[in-house]
Amino acid sequence: VSGSADGAARRLLVTGADTFWGGRVAQAFEADPDVEVVVGMGAHDPSVPLERTDFVRVSDHSYSTVHRIVLATGVDTIVHTGVMVDSTLGSNRLHDVNVIGTLNLLAAAGAAGSTVKALVVKSSGLVYGATSRDPYAFTETMTRATPARTPIERSLLEAEALVRDFAQDNPDVTVSVLRFANVLGADLSTPLSRNLSRPMCPSLFGYDPLLQFVEQGDVVRALIHAVRIAKPGTFNVGAPGRLPLSEVAAICGTRLVPLPPWQAGLFSVPFTRLGAFDLPPELIPLLRYGRGMDTKRFRETGFDYRFSSVEATHAFARAIRLRKGVGHPAENYQYQEDLERFLRHANSVATRAGEPSRPF
């Protein structure tokens, strides 16, 4: 990540640092010598080791709390990864996290005394929906063909509307919104990836939709790239190519279970209760119509994908086979606040060669 426009080192705030994406983005920034400060904010303990990130656990994302953090740390860039894109993680929290949380963050970023000059927001292709009237590939200027029907889609659309209003009201802040395709990765768990890793995967009778993916590592790289280039606007992020669900299932070694297309949610209840697969309401239209996004705008900023959609699928399938052969890797990391404080600030902790000395 290059320094700021005036040559100063970057100071960054990562929201959702306790989540899968926030933790990995914070780790990536920690390794960048041009980043002076990384602040992580989350409601729960981090799930990955953070060596240089100053993590603050907040029980709420109220304006007063976020405002105090932004002013006290003097951050110039915010990476908002805390937006929920999976309703199975808690549908009752969607509005509070996606809408109210985003509103409070934007209010703090635009308040008097704020030093924020750049904002990167992680969003989702869910904002486009999936219908029979969709174009082959959505561009960023297109809108969805029908109103949002699921709570998660409505919350994402509301959050993006708030971000657009903020960008108009704060022209001195560079605002970038990244809409990601469905993500596949060895470490990531989503309704679709869980289904593909199980013996049975739901489908809709008579439909074989084309799917576009993005590999988990490319997601982190895209967010870092967006911070580095500081280009305003909305960008679709999805790997090149699309492939039919039947091919995806064959690569992953799962058997498709066709459900009636007009009562899929009802007929899936016995399967979901048994844990055979997940079928949240936002996944049903995707299994019928698929979704494609035109990613030319983001590629023109200089971003290169390491995986195509097909390559991401094969890499995910290899991870599934490895997991079935050797089991899940042991989760060794557990955040301990007192230990983290000691390791960062105690005089008795030696500084390793090549590391900056701690200010005492």
Q: What kind of region is each of these model predictions?
A:
Residues G7-D32:
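N-terminal Rossmann NAD(P)H-binding glycine-rich loop of SDR-like oxidoreductase domains
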Residues V58-I100, A130:
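NAD(P)H-binding glycine-rich loop region in Rossmannoid oxidoreductase-like domains
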Residues H95-T102, L106, V120-S123, S155-L156, ...:
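Short alpha-helix in the Rossmann-fold core of NAD(P)-dependent oxidoreductases
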Residues N104-P151:
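Conserved Rossmann-fold NAD(P)-dependent oxidoreductase catalytic core, especially the SDR/UDP-sugar
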Residues A148-S176:
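Active-site Tyr-X1-5-Lys
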Residues F166-Q216:
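NAD(P)-dependent short-chain dehydrogenase/reductase
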Residues V220-P281, T295, S308, A315-A317, ...:
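Mid/C-terminal beta-alpha module of Rossmann-like enzyme folds, strongest
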